Amino acid sequence: MKRASELNYTIHHLCIYDDQPRENMWPYLRWHHGITNYFSGAVFHVTGEGHSDYTFLGVGGHAYQIQIEAPPFQFEYERNWWRDHGHGYNHICWVTSNARASMDHLLANGATEVMPFEEFPTYDGFVVHDPEGRWIEVMEYTDEYFKVQEFTHAPAGECGLEMIGNAEVCADVEAMVEWYQEVMDLRILGRYENVVDTVVYLTDKDHDPETRNTVLILQNARQDFEKNHMAEHGPYISAIVYQARHVQRAFEDALWAGMKELQAPQVDPLTGALTAYLREPCGGNVLMLTERLKP
């Protein structure tokens, strides 16, 4: 069996379930984002059911993106999740150099199957739960030409906005930090903790502090809105993470674009970073906007 370090994992995108993607992409576009790809119909339809409707967007940073996916979905497990949870952050997708070996490795190390390994026309892939139940999709590009397009590193707007990753609320932060290091080959960028709260920044093998500052933040439920969501849904993908050179300006731009205020910029007492929280349009999920941390 291959080791995690041999599977070349990189964090690729977050999938958001939403039934009005054409309308709800506009606040993102007004907030300095751009579309990297739109897949629909036969372009990316790999099953005999449902349909594909995928809008990929990003801003400022290299590689990391979001994908708005609309029903009716191609897979039964997707329709079941939509039935149970509705609008939400469904899964984080990772790219690997060997999807078949990746699934064997993950299932042997605490993950549980959601969608079995399948070979599709342009990629091989599968979906699993991590040990706390959050969805992980893993894909391996197999077509010579097909690949979701990427932005170069170019912080956007006068505020210097970059989408850099996701936060996840965990039931056991330490156990999940250990799991993502050992099983998904992540490494710790920074750790912030007191007697109550723990926040750990992790990244993948391709991290570059200037041009590819992709992060996965693992933490306990700290804010009231996180505690409420955790109580209803359990451990979950809690926020899209942005960094900006000018947080206040980026926050004002977000409000103008149509995002909703959850918390105006203030210094996070744990990390020491100026941080704001907003709700985005695809069901009111959370956006975390912070100044750049330098662990």
Task: Describe each region flagged by the PLM.
Residues A4-Y9, C15-Q65, A108, P116-F120, ...:
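Core segments of cupin and vicinal oxygen chelate
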